[in-house]
Amino acid sequence: MPTMVDEHTPPVVAVVVAAGLGTRFGGPVPKQVTSLTGKAVVAVAVESLAAGGCDEAVVVVKEGMHNHLQLALAASPIPVHFVTGGNTRQESVRNGLRFIAQHHRLSDATTVLIHDAVRPLVPAYVVENVIAAVENGAVAVTPVVDVVDTIRQVDGDTSSVVDRSTLRAVQTPQGFKRDIITECHEQLSIEGGSVTDDISCCERYGHHATFVEGSRMSLKITEPVDLDVAEVFAKAAAGAGRHSGRRIGRMLHAVKPSTVARKLGRGSRR
């Protein structure tokens, strides 16, 4: 039974984007509901968010997929709401934010996270640190990891190596002051612009981004081989936890102690 947040405490709400087509993944079912250690990928993602401090989730789904997602999330540890996505990820996020703004309880939220359902194994400490950074005053927060591969910029028959010392790979969940990210998405919709992620949406309108440490565990499931790797990661985390009855998100919590962006210095909110 999902635990409801104290009515006097503004909830931390996660918009979980699960409306993608998954054309590169293929397979008989969408990757969001593909099995990962016996559970749907989206269910594992919501459990991981809950383990890190999210109180409720708004899952954005493709039209016609509501029943599949409701079944997949029937045992969610936190309350889950469903909203139909748009033609693009950007539209889907905006639909999720509008749902929160119009909901009698969720509209009290001041902190919102936006997460890709296909990053199911995000460790709890990453979620905690994103939330803590926002609650300590950051407007837009994203987890990042170092780029470890050599990157070449290719132009026809010529190429050059890109200095990777300042490059970072961006992950989710990204965290925001709800009023600001909502305003930015609405303005972007009016202008007809497009961005690659929600941090870019905030930066477009002059807001500063804050970075916290991400995790290699939080891989994005794009192709079938990614699911195989995620399966190995999840089983390894479960073995390390030695608690077969605990949620995957809780087991991943033990992988690394909680650390927030150094300049903010904040522990877990729970």
Swiss-Prot record:
The keyword Nucleotidyltransferase applies. Gene3D superfamilies: Spore Coat Polysaccharide Biosynthesis Protein SpsA, Chain A (3.90.550.10). CDD domains: CDP-ME_synthetase. It catalyses: 2-C-methyl-D-erythritol 4-phosphate + CTP + H(+) = 4-CDP-2-C-methyl-D-erythritol + diphosphate. Pfam families: IspD (PF01128). Keywords: Isoprene biosynthesis, Nucleotidyltransferase, Transferase. SUPFAM superfamilies: Nucleotide-diphospho-sugar transferases. It is an enzyme of class 2 (transferase). The record marks R164, K220 as: Positions MEP for the nucleophilic attack. InterPro entries: IspD (IPR001228), IspD/TarI (IPR034683), IspD/TarI_cytidylyltransf_bact (IPR050088), ISPD_synthase_CS (IPR018294), Nucleotide-diphossugar_trans (IPR029044). This is 2-C-methyl-D-erythritol 4-phosphate cytidylyltransferase. It comes from Cutibacterium acnes (strain DSM 16379 / KPA171202) (Propionibacterium acnes). The lineage of its organism: Bacteria, Bacillati, Actinomycetota, Actinomycetes, Propionibacteriales.
